């Protein structure tokens, strides 16, 4: 199991007041934003899924610049599958599904539809909103557990976007937590690696790994893509206030799509020395999930993670404008909101329309909220992802 907790940008008002006497500034040749350092705090701990608390060990750390979210985009397949459609192939009905999950529809890739194309469309829309040219992108992070190439899809996305400067592009595999990990990774690359414009994409097509005769899982998942542009900025404008990330491999048995047991050519190696060589082509099993255990895990760990991140940022639930969770189950979303005392009108949810879209769910919901005018520049959002691995994590961010 592992845990990580993150930088606190000086944009947090309470932290800025607490650290103001300690500010130090140094300058050299080059742009001022590259050489201005603010003294901020970070804290970390290593704990398990059943034991978390706010870290009280704080040590000063220098952060040269911040990062902010300046554009979003999303894309969905054209085929919509309703609960009534599913009732034609498994023993279920609309009321049974909607009461237990909050889901009524989901979108599914079919035929020659490509997840890479879907992700590229979402990324293109995010660039348009941010008014950033593709040639100015210097990193592409593709958060997915369902790449269309074993070795990853991110380079193909940068190609599809027409990025001519060969930006660093790679995949992040962390299931439904992937987008939150992607945001934190982008921030770390910007703060410590000199990157300026990072595309963070969450995209998954879990419908390809669903047993469509299993009503316990086929009702849950849909396909989609969402993206944001994370841009470097002065430390004072930093839009990632704090984060809190975890994993616990002991819970992997509750939610997995494991590789099938290798099949081998038993006719080889009559002397027994190479009996199981060469193996045949491997493939993955359908998604297997213990729904009750996943529900317990999410309701226990997600509020703890958000509370921890808020504490590191010097904030509490009343300071956030929006709660944006991975869209897995409406009961989970409501339970976490109740624990954090966040009213329903401050919850972002589009689960009913799209189902669980894994790494795409957070950026998809965020993009819709931004384009509808609900999320405005300056709004503070507590976001959290959780899923297979088990992995979970939260980030306190500011839009714009």
UniProtKB/Swiss-Prot annotation:
State its location(s). Plastid, Chloroplast
- Specify the signal sequence span: none
Keyword Repressor attributed? no
Top-rank taxon of the source lineage equals Eukaryota
Q: Which InterPro entries match?
A: ACP_syn_III_C, ACP_syn_III_N, FabH, Thiolase-like
> Which residues does UniProt mark as catalytic?
176, 326, 356
Record's keyword terms, sorted: Chloroplast, Fatty acid biosynthesis, Fatty acid metabolism, Lipid biosynthesis, Lipid metabolism, Plastid, Transferase, Transit peptide
Give the similarity note. Answer: Belongs to the thiolase-like superfamily. FabH family.
Q: What name does this protein carry?
A: Beta-ketoacyl-[acyl-carrier-protein] synthase III A, chloroplastic
